[in-house]
Amino acid sequence: MADQLTEEQIAEFKEAFSLFDKDGDGTITTKELGTVMRSLGQNPTEAELQDMINEVDADGNGTIDFPEFLTMMARKMKDTDSEEEIREAFRVFDKDGNGYISAAELRHVMTNLGEKLTDEEVDEMIREADIDGDGQVNYEEFVTMMTSK
């Protein structure tokens, strides 16, 4: 996981890690973790922090060493990438760029993908994703649909 990071990213994370490794012993406490991540533009909730700590703190001693920290940051960045992929997919469907996917736009993309759908099938797909009932799919609805699997 951490091997997918660039040298620049690793250097950036090392710098941030060092800032919070007060006594220079190569570990940071779980309490310091949230501060480190926020300094890098991440915004984890308390529950997310606890989950991340539990995942990487193998010996359960409440501290995290740098390799563990790198693994965790790489995971967090992977999540961010998938958000960008969803945004990109939405742009593909939203042909006219008005912020909504209409039945016609959905039909067009599905046809290009080799999916020959009836009008009823297309309308049903829109209905399933259309939370506010306006007959089209906005970005928030699209994200909900894409992440609810």
Swiss-Prot record:
The modification N-acetylalanine is found at residue 2. Keywords: Acetylation, Calcium, Metal-binding, Methylation, Repeat. Ca(2+) 4 binds at residues 130, 132, 134, 136, 141. The modification N6,N6,N6-trimethyllysine is found at residue 116. Ca(2+) 3 binds at residues 94, 96, 98, 100, 105. Ca(2+) 1 binds at residues 21, 23, 25, 27, 32. This is Calmodulin. Residues 8-43, 44-79, 81-116, 117-149 form the EF-hand domain. The keyword DNA-binding does not apply. GO terms for cellular component: myosin II complex. This protein has four functional calcium-binding sites. Transmembrane segments: none annotated. The lineage of its organism: Eukaryota, Metazoa, Echinodermata, Eleutherozoa, Echinozoa. Calmodulin mediates the control of a large number of enzymes, ion channels and other proteins by Ca(2+). Among the enzymes to be stimulated by the calmodulin-Ca(2+) complex are a number of protein kinases and phosphatases.
